[in-house]
Amino acid sequence: TLFPYTTLFRSGLQLPKHTFYVDNIFVYQPLPHVKHMYYLDVNFYRYYIGREDQSVNEKVMIGRIDQQLLVTKLMLGYYDVTKIANRKLRHYMVQYLEIMMTISSVLAIKSGTDENLEKKKELWQYLKKQNLPLYLRLRTGFLGQGCNLPGKGGRKLLIAGYKITQKFYGFN
């Protein structure tokens, strides 16, 4: 993603220091300030996936869950996405947040620790307090319901669904 400097400046973009996963912020925060978008079929950057220490490796992501949660919380606070006038932009931004909430929730559950389950709960409570309409939209959606199935059985069902999705789409 390439943005003109003026777009980044207008958006007030400030990335947290010494934090992984800020590429999500870089793509998300300036987007409402973009007036025109162009697709160029050019590889500006090649990302080799497969190293064990890579930041997108599932085990590494679980180890850095606090950074994932921080980035997600920051993104939740940038805009009241339910009030974005452009319907397509609003839809995209809501979906992006839904994906971020899902990733954070799945990682917390996959970690298997009570501490991270509590952090997941706190993230959803943060969203509820920050933006109730968005919370209701995400929480009652398919992914939100799946991420919050009750009990150990619900968490096992979510992980089974995650593994099936993982095989189908080939991520991590």
Predicted regions and their residues:
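Short, surface-exposed acidic
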Residues: 86-90, 135-137
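Amphipathic alpha-helical repeat scaffolds of TPR domains
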Residues: 92-107
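Short, charged, amphipathic alpha-helical segments
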Residues: 89-95, 117-121
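Membrane-interface aromatic/basic loop that binds lipid-linked glycans or pyrophosphate carriers
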Residues: 110-172
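Catalytic core of nucleotide-sugar-dependent glycosyltransferases
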Residues: 42-51, 57-84, 103, 107-133
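Conserved nucleotide-sugar donor-binding catalytic segment
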Residues: 4-61
